Curated annotation (Swiss-Prot):
Protein source organism: Malvaviscus arboreus
Record's bilayer topology term: Multi-pass membrane protein
GO BP, one annotated term: electron transport coupled proton transport
GO molecular function, one term: NADH dehydrogenase (ubiquinone) activity
Record protein name field: NAD(P)H-quinone oxidoreductase subunit 5, chloroplastic
Subcellular location: Plastid, Chloroplast thylakoid membrane
EC number: 7.1.1.-
Family classification: Belongs to the complex I subunit 5 family.
Top-rank EC class of the record's enzyme: translocase
InterPro entries, alphabetized: NADH_UbQ_OxRdtase_chlpt_su5_C, NADHpl_OxRdtase_5_subgr, ND/Mrp_TM, NU5C-like, Proton_antipo_N
Subunit structure: NDH is composed of at least 16 different subunits, 5 of which are encoded in the nucleus.
One Pfam family, short name: Proton_antipo_C
UniProt keyword list: Chloroplast, Membrane, NAD, NADP, Plastid, Plastoquinone, Quinone, Thylakoid, Translocase, Transmembrane, Transmembrane helix, Transport
């Protein structure tokens, strides 16, 4: 056992040779390295698999003994200051290591096929290896300085991967937005680290917690300053985990390749903020107002993330907002002191969201056979529909991931989300009402994504790329902005949006297949059609389906004879849980079934509403009299229309938050820069030049007067 812990320092460095070797190969043997580029996927996956096996071994030992192991090397700079660096192994480290490596392996296998056509294949795998190294280094860090170093490396890798296709303006702008937004949080994190070092004189976690608790107990610190430092630490987590108000980078980050979206949203970048708060929870929990702040930010993010996807048309952006909402649930749980529930939801959400993003990548990959390489079209849900016929395996996998995120038993997210929802009643009834309501909204918008993508007919064939409408039906927009003439123009809630007809698709060679004939409402023409992805992409999705089905069993919260399956509590013990002081205080069967029935009912209502509004659209057009009967004018209908327009505008405009930042911050900073430039050129330079000119004329005058 001791040997496993002693060699744990190697965990972050195992994947590191790959980017180094790729760089050396491209520098010394560029032609051979590029010709053999597909070879690099295997050692990448192999090295990460070694780390996964090592992490599983550590977790087994943690379950058996709940050990905390720390090894520190000291570097003495002078007699007054020494820098210590090392590694810290506990249950949180082992859980995060397993999460990073398992999801990372599946994403790498998937990426081998997904990125095979891309000229940046080698660069992508080098960035991915460096990303995994940075995350593993972060979770094994023994002090705040190491955390900050790897924190910055994670941010750098995300910048490189989000802007992987940097020639596309959308990707270039997205990586800059992510970088700048995270710099705000990183600056706060650095100030918070320095503040706590000034208070305690230590960066090491165990020494920091012990010294700080003694200072608080003896009332030897200024509470306002401590609260400020803790808030600055939390600001770093807010930015990285896309919490309000620093969440604006996350939807735009979808401009990167889909595999990296899966990794960022499941187990790497957005998980770092949750990890940081979980790691520093012994510090936060003794500061009176910080836990309230964490839970408040969490519940605001939950609500915001559940309302913004309601009118999004890009499939990846809708999933990005769902990630934001689920991260809000985790942050809410940490703010409530429910450490175990937050960690449980982090695990279950990671596998479910990885499955959904890989599924969306499979969808986008198949749609590119129809629309060519055009992200605005290949990711547009309203041009999809009917993909269940063309990609049945992807459809089943995506449906399982969707049901899990909705909280339907016995899938993974049901167990963790239900635990957070149950704990919220013990913390605050207001927060509980918001959390339960957003659970229904989650089910609604997730099934909206599923129905628009897989059910009905392939909507792309209702409009030609030239912009000429092949069917009058395609004049319909979502929420009734514009409609077909046969229907009353005030009817709302159609699940279609018009496409951007000004953008040309770019066909990828060898990626287009032809169908002899497709008949859509009497319209006949030979079309390209979507197709199921290759086995290399389907295999990791099927493995993630198994994780989504069974990973919830590690922490089923029942404490009955013969049903004690709660492995997570053994792994996380001793852990902080302010809501359940007694470690044996779990739900009995009746309480669990009551809460579960209520949560499933709310999710079922959201799914039912989505089916009503987003059922296959063209079949509903067969009964135009019924549709027109719904659209009759009246005071209630006018009021409902106003509510619908309000919801649509709120969601489509991203809650006006990006607009507010653009006006108040971007334009304000640019205006300040222009004012500074004007002041520098006209005033500062004017004074300098004026002094010079004055000296010249005075000298000339003296020269003239003196003869």
């Amino acid at each position: 056992m001791e040997h496993a812990y002693q060699y744990s320092w190697i965990i972050p460095f195992v994947p590191l040779p790959i980017p180094i070797l790729i760089g050396i190969g491209l520098l010394l043997f560029p032609t051979a390295t590029k010709n053999l580029r597909r070879m690099w996927a295997f050692p990448n996956i192999l090295l990460l698999s070694i780390v996964m096996i090592f992490s599983i071994d550590l977790s087994i030992q943690q379950i058996n003994g709940s050990y905390i192991y720390q090894y520190v090397w000291s570097w003495t700079i002078n007699n007054d200051f020494s820098f210590e660096f090392g590694y810290f192994i506990d249950s949180l480290t082992s859980i995060m290591s397993i999460l990073i490596t398992t999801v990372g392996i599946f994403v790498l296998i998937y990426s081998d096929n997904y990125m095979s056509h891309d000229q940046g294949y080698l660069r992508f795998f080098a960035y991915m290896s460096l990303f995994n190294t940075s995350m593993l280094g972060l979770v094994t860090s023994s002090n705040l300085i190491q955390i900050y170093i790897f924190w910055e490396l994670v941010g750098m890798c995300s910048y490189l991967l989000i802007g992987f296709w940097f020639t596309r303006p959308a990707a270039a702008n997205a990586c800059q937005k992510a970088f700048v937004t995270n710099r705000i949080g990183d600056f706060g994190l650095l100030l918070g680290i320095l503040g706590f070092y000034w208070i305690t004189g230590s960066f090491e976690f165990q020494x920091l917690f012990e010294i700080f608790n003694n200072l608080i107990y003896n009332n030897e610190v200024h509470l306002l300053f401590v609260t400020l430092c803790a808030s600055l630490l939390f600001a770093g987590a807010v930015a990285k985990s896309a919490q309000f108000p620093l969440h604006v980078w996350l939807p735009d980050a979808m401009x990167g390749p889909t595999p990296i979206s899966a990794l960022i949203h499941a187990a790497t970048m957005v998980a770092t903020g949750i990890f940081l708060v979980a790691r520093l929870l012994p510090l936060f929990i003794v500061i009176p107002y910080i836990m309230n702040l964490i839970s408040l930010i969490g519940i605001i993010t939950v609500l915001l993330g559940a309302t913004l996807p309601l009118a999004q048309k890009x499939i990846k952006r809708g999933l990005a907002y769902s990630t934001m909402s689920q991260l809000g649930y985790m942050m809410l749980a940490l703010g409530m002191g429910s450490y175990r529930a937050a960690l449980f939801h982090l695990i279950t959400h990671a596998y479910s969201k990885a499955l959904l993003f890989l599924g969306s990548g499979s969808i986008i990959h198949s749609m590119e056979a129809v629309v060519g390489y055009s992200p605005e079209k290949s990711q547009n849900m309203v041009l999809m529909g009917g993909l269940r016929k063309h990609a049945p395996i992807t459809q089943i996998a995506f449906l399982i991931g969707t049901l899990s995120l909705c909280g339907i038993p016995p899938l993974a997210c049901f167990w963790s989300k239900d635990e957070i929802l149950s704990d919220s009643w013990l913390y605050s009834p207001i927060f509980a009402i918001i959390a339960w309501s957003t659970a229904g909204l989650t089910a609604f918008y997730m099934f909206r994504i599923y129905l628009l993508t897989f059910e009905g007919h392939l909507n792309i064939y209702f409009q030609k790329y030239s912009g000429k409408k092949s069917s009058s039906f395609y004049s319909i927009k979502l929420w009734g902005k514009e409609e077909q003439k046969m229907i009353n123009r005030n009817f709302r809630l159609f699940p279609l949006l018009t496409m951007n007809k000004n953008e040309k698709p770019y066909t990828i060679g060898g990626n287009v297949k032809k169908r002899a004939l497709i008949t859509n409402f009497g319209y006949k023409e030979a079309f390209s059609y979507p197709h199921e992805s290759d086995n290399t992409m389907l295999f990791p999705m099927l493995i993630l389906v198994l994780f989504t089905l069974f990973v919830g069993a590690i922490a089923i919260p029942l404490n009955q004879e013969g049903m004690h399956l709660d492995i997570l509590s053994k792994l996380x013990x001793p852990s902080i849980n302010x809501l359940h002081k007694n470690s044996n205080d779990f739900e009995d069967s009746y309480q669990f079934l009551t809460n579960a029935t209520f949560s499933v009912s709310i999710a079922g209502f959201g799914i039912f509403t989505a089916f009503l509004l987003y059922k296959p659209f063209y079949s509903s057009l067969l009964n135009l009299n019924l549709l027109n009967s719904f659209s009759k004018k009246g005071p209630k209908r006018i009021f409902l229309d106003k509510i619908i327009y309000l919801i649509y505008d709120w969601s489509y405009x991203r809650g006006y938050i990006d607009t507010f930042y653009s006006i108040s911050l971007t334009k304000g900073i640019r205006g300040l820069a222009e004012l500074t430039h004007f002041f520098d050129r006209r005033v500062i330079d004017g004074i300098t030049n004026g002094v010079g000119i004055t000296s010249f004329f005075v000298g000339e005058g003296i020269k003239y007067x003196g003869g």
